[in-house]
Regions:
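Conserved, well-structured beta-alpha core segment at the onset of a catalytic domain
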Residues: 1-9, 108, 112, 196-197, ...
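A structural signal for short, well-ordered beta-strand segments and their strand-loop junctions
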Residues: 11-15, 114, 137
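Short, surface-exposed basic-aromatic patches at helix termini and helix-loop junctions that form
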Residues: 2-5, 104-105, 127-134, 221
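C-terminal alpha-helical cap of glycosyltransferases
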Residues: 209-232
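Catalytic binding pocket for nucleotide-activated donors in carbohydrate/polymer assembly enzymes
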Residues: 115, 120-198, 202-206
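Acidic donor-binding loop of glycosyltransferase active sites
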Residues: 103-120
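Conserved catalytic-core segment of nucleotide-activated headgroup transferases in glycan assembly
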Residues: 1-103, 183, 190, 230
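Alpha-helix termini
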Residues: 1-7, 148-157, 226-227
Length: 232
């Protein structure tokens, strides 16, 4: 069924490498035939088993992402306005289904979600905004903490990066905040979204190596001094 709170269709992609075997043969066959199938006819094809996943898994029955997909009550019907794609493979351009390098795939996104429970820094959200793709992360990532200091408050979507508060006990709250954030982005006009993209790119320029290298040099200098002192 359609989610009435959404004003447009949403393709939610879970691109997380897992214990995969190989690309799905049945899906590859469908993709080979797609050029010879009229678009209208293609929508009438019967769904594949477990239609959301791109690759075979060694541990399909016990994979937590698969279990969550089936347990959350999300409709996998083609009539739904929320569509799910689970890619359990590294995107190196040769995965057998997507066949596109990660950075090319990234630029096709509208919003990237990195709900870190622990991340000393986090380069993936920085890469996202460098390409002008807004993202969401948490205050438990070094990147999220840095963003908050740069904007002077808990960052929100209009800053180019949304930073939510995550603790040991607020998993459900975070999930709801992420859903609300995605819904909010889906309701933006083209002009509003472009402004957020511009904010994301502008923020990424503050995290270049020419600005950060001094911190690495300071850290290495302190490490060498500490090591020399311990050897005396």
């Amino acid at each position: 069924e359609k989610n009435k709170s959404l004003s447009r269709e949403v393709l939610a992609v879970i691109a997380v490498p897992c214990w995969k075997k190989e690309a799905r043969k049945d899906l590859q066959e469908r993709l080979k035939k797609k050029n010879g199938i009229k678009i209208l006819d293609a929508t009438e094809c019967s769904p594949l088993p477990h239609p959301f996943i791109t690759h075979e898994l060694y541990n399909f029955e016990s994979e937590k992402i698969v279990s969550a997909i089936y347990n959350c009550g999300l409709s996998l019907s083609k009539n739904s306005n929320i569509h799910l794609l689970f890619i359990p493979s590294y995107l190196d351009g040769q995965d057998g289904i997507i066949n596109m390098p990660y950075y090319d795939f990234l630029t096709a996104s509208d919003y990237c979600i990195y709900p870190s429970y622990y991340e000393p820094w986090g380069y993936t959200p920085l890469e996202s905004i460098a390409f002008g793709i807004p993202c969401l992360t948490t205050n438990l990532s070094g990147f999220g903490q840095w963003v908050n200091t740069q904007v002077g408050h808990q960052a929100i979507l209009s800053d180019g990066v949304a930073v939510i508060q995550r603790t040991d006990n607020n998993y459900e709250q975070c999930a709801c905040e992420i859903a609300v954030s995605i819904q909010g982005l889906s309701m933006l006009s083209d002009l509003e979204y472009i402004k957020i993209q511009e904010a994301a790119r502008k923020l990424s320029l503050k995290a270049q190596w020419k600005d950060f290298i001094k911190y690495y040099l300071d850290a290495y200098t302190l490490s060498l001094k500490y090591n020399a002192t311990n050897r005396q």
